[in-house]
């Protein structure tokens, strides 16, 4: 429902809730952290989530506050229930939603060689998410700098931003991307496309939320890039110059 947060919103937007799909994306990122803690030998790795919904710095701060409130609520409920009997914990609506997200996004892992079950994830979840930070990254005075090098124990962060995230900024260990923006500008799309690269060792945990319009643009770019690559390869075989 675009009425919750219009695509063409104004800089004065000051709502108090966002899309259900964003909350689903947030739960996915939290769960992915727990899964990596279970699977990875190296625990001190950087893990990031990207949220790009507005070009207005004021609106980005509002979004950050909403995300902070939601994540704090999840942390609080996980802390209160993670030592309860599993069936009883699932009577908590927050935990029930986490289980639904796990079943939707990651349940197939239970049947893989390094299978991870819900019980394992829930037991690990609080430790995995307790140090996740939510920051806003933009040109404003309240912006945070993502100093990954200063966090030797691994920075776990949800970054909310706009243009700064679209052009040039690298998010280490990016696993979850939520992108509610439409742009048809080729170079901007290509720059943002690097978010979605192959992530060795955790590519199966990466998830992307896009609008249908953005998806169609990326599909077009993919086909164009593949055609160009094929043409260059053919010209090389024929000893021709581009």
Residue locations for each model-derived region?
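Catalytic or ion-translocation cores adjacent to nucleophile or general acid/base/metal-coordination motifs
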Residues: 1, 155, 170-242
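Conserved interdomain linker/interface between the two RecA-like ATPase lobes of SF2 helicase motors
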Residues: 1-66
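Short, well-ordered loop/turn elements at secondary-structure boundaries
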Residues: 25, 43-46, 128-131, 151-156, ...
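Catalytic micro-motifs at enzyme active sites that drive phosphoryl/nucleotidyl and oxygen chemistry
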Residues: 38, 147-148, 164-166, 195-196
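Short His-Asn-centered micro-motif
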Residues: 52-54, 137-138, 157-163, 179-182, ...
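Flexible loop/turn segments at secondary-structure boundaries
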Residues: 57-60, 141-146, 166-167, 184-188, ...
């Amino acid at each position: 429902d675009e009425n919750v947060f219009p695509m063409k919103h104004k800089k004065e937007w000051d709502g108090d809730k966002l899309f259900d799909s964003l909350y689903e994306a947030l739960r996915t990122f939290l769960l992915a952290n727990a899964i990596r803690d279970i699977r990875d030998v190296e625990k001190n790795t950087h893990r990031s989530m990207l949220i790009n919904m507005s070009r207005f710095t004021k609106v980005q701060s509002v979004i950050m506050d909403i995300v902070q409130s939601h994540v704090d609520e999840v942390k609080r409920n996980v802390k209160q229930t993670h030592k309860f009997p599993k069936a009883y914990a699932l009577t908590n609506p927050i935990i029930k939603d986490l289980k639904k997200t796990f079943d939707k996004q990651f349940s197939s892992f239970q049947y893989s060689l390094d299978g991870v079950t819900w019980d394992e994830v829930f037991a690990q979840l609080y430790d995995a998410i307790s140090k996740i930070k939510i920051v806003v990254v933009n040109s404003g005075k309240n912006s945070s700098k993502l100093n990954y090098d200063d966090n030797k124990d691994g920075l776990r962060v949800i970054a909310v931003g706009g243009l700064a995230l679209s052009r040039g900024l690298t998010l280490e260990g990016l696993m979850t991307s939520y992108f509610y923006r439409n742009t048809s500008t080729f170079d901007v799309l290509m720059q943002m496309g690097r978010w979605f690269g192959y992530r060795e060792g955790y590519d199966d945990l990466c998830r992307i939320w896009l609008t249908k319009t953005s998806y169609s643009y990326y599909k077009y770019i993919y086909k164009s890039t593949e055609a160009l690559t094929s043409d260059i390869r053919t010209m090389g075989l024929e000893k021709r110059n581009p």
